[in-house]
Amino acid sequence: MSNPTHKTSLHLKEENNQVSPKFSLRRNLILACLLVGVLFSLTGCVNFPHQPPEKGPNIPQEPKLFIIILDALKHKTLMESLDSLPNFNGVIKGNKLAYPYIYFENVLVSIPSSSKPSNTTLLTGVYPCRHGVPSTLWFDRKEEKVITLKSITQRRIVNILEKTDTDTIFDYARRSGKSAMAVATQVTKGIDRRDWIKQSVHLWGQAFWVNLFQDGNSIPDGAHLDRGTTKGLLGGHMYTLTDGLEGKLRTTGSIPDLTVVHYIGMDIFTHYPRRFMVKENWTVDEIQRWYLKEVLDPELGKIVAFLKENRLFENTVFFFVADHGQTRIVKHIDERNFEQRLAKKLKVRGRPYSIREADIVIMPGASTKVMYVKNRMGADWMSPPRLLEDVKPVIDALIDDKDVEEHLNMLLVAQYPGERDKDLKGPGESDVFWFFNPNSYRQSDRKDDDFLNALEPLSKLDEFVGKELKAAYMYRRDFDRKNTPDIILINKPGYHFTPDRGKYAHHGGIYADDAYVSFVASGPGIHHFSDHPRTITRQIDTLDLVPMAAHLAGIKIDKPIDGKDRLVELK
């Protein structure tokens, strides 16, 4: 091997072949710094072991749990596609069907099925009314400001969970003495910053250019993001000094007890599929099956290869979950024009009124859309609006809108039990919302009595969408007092408010395509918990993930949550 010091000196020697002591010291310092920098880049961490540990576990251990969040994966799609997915098939069913997998076929998402509340519910095990994240954007009536959760750092979700004293699976793992890692997750409370591998701005920028050049689409490429997620899982993140599985194994001799990986690419890809798919009118199921085969199955193969290479695979359990589904968009509703038309009749925030000046605040929507109505006699937004004087004029304006008449299926109206209209003749206030049928009211004279008679029990909602979706039950657990909207518009399936007409599919609704997903737990370590393959058709909820994951990873849940451990019920 050549001597780098000698090579350097050849270029720097003086005429008498002498090097001054001062220069020699400087040169050695530079070389030493370069050497340290190279080692630092290769390892991606700052903790170096004195000697490399042997590969694989040396003594029997509890299985290592991998929770793989497949964002927006529809109900049953994964299990129905296994024949074309060799890596998923190998992890779920095993060689010669050896693994006694547990398949939860019908898992209900907390509604409406938007990303931030769905993921927060998924990893906390409690409903939005408890964890405080009811949507991606909402109006805080008490603070009189709009809250938005569009952030790479996810710090705002952490702040909300701390304020509501809500713990995550990572909190429970830490208190149970279990190590954990989170990769590209939207919920990070409880995870040490050195154990959270996030998707960098660089990765998203690369994904944008990749999709622009290969498909002419100015939307980040979901496949590039997911490949970057796997790379981060295995190799870590050099800019934030976080170790991936390779670094953890090298420095500690093991991998985390719990690893949560969020593959967000399918959600983006289903929103904006390849142009040839749009041209050929592919269904959402066809798009997602293609993505599973071409993108996610190879990524899972990389994880399995790493685990097998290091003799770790036989001691793992994989829990594949989804946060919500997707629905093909039938028609885009022009949100701006909709608000502009309402602004001709009402004082709408931003058109041009401030929150203090406005009578209503309209939030961006998808399959559903919420509105906050001000009590014009009240001092602030926390005062319940009067039914006839404040709420009825807004609904009258909505009923006359041409888009609403075409796309609206039903309305919900907030009740405020015990806070208003105590002497008002009409329906009692004992629930969070009333069900309001706009079609029957539209045909009436729209007098005060007609309006009050159109307010029906919230349970009526279940008759419209199907009792199995538990829509009324879910809406009772979505909002807390300070963020409860006064009016919720629920569109027909496939009708979406969206400013982007290029979007092919979306979520955020209360119907089956959005609200049903599936879970499956398997892998070589699943034999500790199951003795034969099981398909559970009984309905469970996404918030049941936390107690079931705790069961699989030996984590103690030390405070009340809403989710239930469905694995105990299998015994």
Question: Where is each model-derived feature located?
Answer:
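His/Asp/Glu-rich, glycine-adjacent segments
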Residues: V126-W282, T498
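Beta-strand elements within well-structured catalytic alpha/beta cores of enzymes
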Residues: E62-K76, V91-I92, L122, A173, ...
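C-terminal motif of bacterial Sec signal peptides marking the signal peptidase cleavage site
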Residues: T43-G44
